[in-house]
Amino acid sequence: MIRVAISGAAGRMGRSLIQAACQYEGITLGAASEYPDSHLIGSDAGEVARVGALQIPLVDDLGKNKEAFDLLIDFTRPEVSMANLVLCRDQGKAMVVGTTGFTKEQRQEITRAAIEIPIVLAPNMSVGVNLCLKLLEMAASVLKDDVDIEIIEAHHRHKVDSPSGTALRMGEVVAETLGRNLDQCAIYGRQGLRSERPRESIGFSSLRAGDIVGEHTVIFAAEGERIEISHKASSRMTFALGAMRASQWVSDKPPGLYDMQDVLGLLKKVN
């Protein structure tokens, strides 16, 4: 049985992760944390997630319960994830990280930590989204430079980073397949008068509204036809169950930096 700790356990995603851990075979909840000033510190994690009492209190520092878990699942914010990274590296514990919005320097620090511990880092742990990434690779390899490419994403009004980590990963997959550098070809939003759209550019548009869980569409537009590859999530449980699958997969892996393509066995390149 794999004992997982969940950081940010009282948040929307954290509660879904607790629910998923309680129903996923081979996984059990060992510890749960919330930010230090939360009024829920000390509350039963199961009651917070509405799955019934689990006798696991929310703590403000997982270091206090380091013997209670084997692996940490983190869907929080970059600064919290980086603090948890230090804890897991020092304790030799695996991590599954779904946090987005990391800086280049923070990603480099995660890469260095992966020399010592196994880490699954993925902006989206939905099986469907990761299948879409493979479809995007296939589409880009066939369509090449003969199409205009736009990525549109929508999330709830509380999401703080934009574009989403998933949208950026989709852009990276397309750019890498086409031999482009996303940092050089990405255009984030458009306003006012501009020159004609450069063919090599990849456009991003973001919507933030209501309670949208997550929607992503990549458009390949040519003269006379348009291909759209879309994914729409209706529940956070799709991400939570993906995180459980990643946790089970990485639990016996050697140190290294992995993503959901590794977890799902989708790394074989499209010809």
UniProtKB/Swiss-Prot annotation:
Pathway: Amino-acid biosynthesis; L-lysine biosynthesis via DAP pathway; (S)-tetrahydrodipicolinate from L-aspartate: step 4/4
Family according to the record: Belongs to the DapB family.
A single GO BP: lysine biosynthetic process via diaminopimelate
Subcellular location field: Cytoplasm
Pfam families: DapB_C, DapB_N
Active site: 155 (proton donor/acceptor), 159 (proton donor)
Record-linked InterPro entries: DapB_C, DapB_N, DapB_N_CS, DHDPR_bac, NAD(P)-bd_dom_sf
Source organism: Nitrosococcus oceani (strain ATCC 19707 / BCRC 17464 / JCM 30415 / NCIMB 11848 / C-107)
Catalytic reaction annotation: (S)-2,3,4,5-tetrahydrodipicolinate + NAD(+) + H2O = (2S,4S)-4-hydroxy-2,3,4,5-tetrahydrodipicolinate + NADH + H(+); (S)-2,3,4,5-tetrahydrodipicolinate + NADP(+) + H2O = (2S,4S)-4-hydroxy-2,3,4,5-tetrahydrodipicolinate + NADPH + H(+)
Gene3D superfamilies: Dihydrodipicolinate Reductase, domain 2, NAD(P)-binding Rossmann-like Domain
Positions contributing to NAD(+) binding: 8-13, 34, 98-100, 122-125
Annotated protein name in UniProt: 4-hydroxy-tetrahydrodipicolinate reductase
Function (record text): Catalyzes the conversion of 4-hydroxy-tetrahydrodipicolinate (HTPA) to tetrahydrodipicolinate.
Main location: cytoplasm
Signal peptide region: none
Enzyme Commission number: 1.17.1.8
